[in-house]
Amino acid sequence: MAHKKAAGSTRNGRDSESKRLGVKRYGGESVSAGSIIVRQRGTRFHAGSNVGIGKDHTLFAKAEGQVKFETKGPQNRKFVSIVPAA
């Protein structure tokens, strides 16, 4: 009786590709319009002023300026805004 499984019969050996989620531009960084700021699943970060949200909840800059992260509201939600360059 074999004490090792035959080659090719293992139940392991697969893994999903990483999705490269997370913050792409940090607070204080300069961005141009269209730059991706955060890639996320769901709204961990909410869109503030001059920030748009894509169908996959990606946050992107609508204007040129500096990235600003802030916490607001009774639920302490995290918002990302773009402060236009003056």
Curated annotation (Swiss-Prot):
Q: Which InterPro entries match?
A: Ribosomal_bL27, Ribosomal_bL27_CS
* Keyword field contains rRNA-binding: no
Could you tell me which residues belong to the region Disordered? 1-26
Single annotated GO MF: structural constituent of ribosome
SUPFAM superfamilies recorded for this chain? Ribosomal L27 protein-like (SSF110324)
The residue range of the signal peptide is none
Q: Name one GO cellular component term.
A: cytosolic large ribosomal subunit
Query: Biological process GO annotation list?
Result: translation
User: Which keywords does the record carry?
Assistant: Ribonucleoprotein, Ribosomal protein
Instruction: Tell me the PROSITE patterns matching this sequence.
Output: RIBOSOMAL_L27
- What family is this protein classified in? Belongs to the bacterial ribosomal protein bL27 family.
User: Mind telling me what this protein is named?
Assistant: Large ribosomal subunit protein bL27
| The gene coding this protein | rpmA
